């Protein structure tokens, strides 16, 4: 059940918006209106308030059942499933018995998967050379490839020359959730133990500091943090090697970065938020196999982003469309969701949708840092693959093929080490250094290196258009071999400017036909969580959202969240506001954890199975 967004009925708040008080006065007003003698408790999660200090937990049995495996994989996306499949393929070919366990927080494989998606099939075909015979859902080869620059009223076509990264010749338009579901079936047929609905909540360590495995999350905890009568401790899964394939900005990967200092020699990751819808359209507007990409309006030149519109051949006139907004944007008044809704009204987009019906909505963060932001990938007992470390080719607008290849290479490296007659390890958890070496010698590394300067080239005075000029000159001539590497501008959360330095953005109201409100959109994601559990959007300090984020940045979390999770509502007594977290609405996009200017929000897993229920997104 979704939580409806509260109506901000506070007279002071309404007065501010009605009179459009000058932006220079906002921090002063916000601080005064937010003044309150006590800060209401928001966070009740045990990661913030440890249970060993809570009397309500005295006498509760906290023992966990443990299982052992050779390899444990966290996350059933393209990378995790590729690793699982390749491991079992190798085990069968060499008649080896290797136990592979894969845990996935979604209730069904593919239910948390969201992507455009236009697939470069190279790695997929390598993994499944007989994919046609097995009925893989690659139904829509690209037949037409278009790119354009949008102004408010016009579309300026740009030719896609052979060799440029955005060329889609030979690619397929896919519903990635369906493809992942099919891969899950292949993995199980090979003997992989797949456990959907089990969220990996904790990294376990040996006494020597190497990774021992993971623990799934506890269930049966009340919203206030007390144990229910149905409380059950999570399961421990121990392994010789644990593969972390959580996807973009994984919460366990965050811990591993700190534990093993994996980002010591790379730049901070930079991200985008991708918002997507599926529509059934009028058949006369349907062009199966057409791929459309644009940059420009509704975003300004200093806000990185772009759109996609893909015509699928799935037995009905179906299109997938979306907008990606770089999370290094500076204006706290920007709402990626409302920019997406506005984009659909462009004269080159709206005619495709008129007379159609929207059937699905979702959102997910994606990595945009590229080559410069790749961390160290291996550590004692584990390794990172896929979108967790970030192998997306940004100008190509693709990361599934590189994620799959990283999973394949990880599996081959692990298999070699597990089956080596001279297996030796300085730590209890195996350190598979061969994986990183093999990746650096693969086409993945070469591909990402060749486009390393395109995303940071958009930070110049010309913004996105400067990046296009750079691509046209240097990539076209030098193919990424220029003797320099551009840098990013720091972490995304650092880029946000105070509200007083920015202009509020006036968004048009949704018309209910082409554009829609937030709550009706989230309803189409199938999102659901157990209501009586602690919010998994935790705050390190409950006072910061009002005292800092609202005061200085006008509460950007109420805009950057694409699911209406965060609201500033009037306090029940006295003047001021408090932050309300509608955790049930969360679509697990991770944007809040990334963009919060105070880095106060920490996303952790809810009870397993909760979250969106995407169907082929």
UniProtKB/Swiss-Prot annotation:
The modification N6-acetyllysine is found at residues 96, 132, 223, 357. A ubiquinone binds at residues 305-306. It is an enzyme of class 1 (oxidoreductase). Residues 1-33 form a transit peptide. FAD binds at residues 71-85. Keywords: 4Fe-4S, Acetylation, Electron transport, FAD, Flavoprotein, Iron, Iron-sulfur, Membrane, Metal-binding, Mitochondrion, Mitochondrion inner membrane, Oxidoreductase, Phosphoprotein, Transit peptide, Transport, Ubiquinone. This is Electron transfer flavoprotein-ubiquinone oxidoreductase, mitochondrial. Residues 109-130, 428-447 dip into the membrane without crossing it. Its EC number is 1.5.5.1. Binds 1 [4Fe-4S] cluster. The gene is ETFDH.
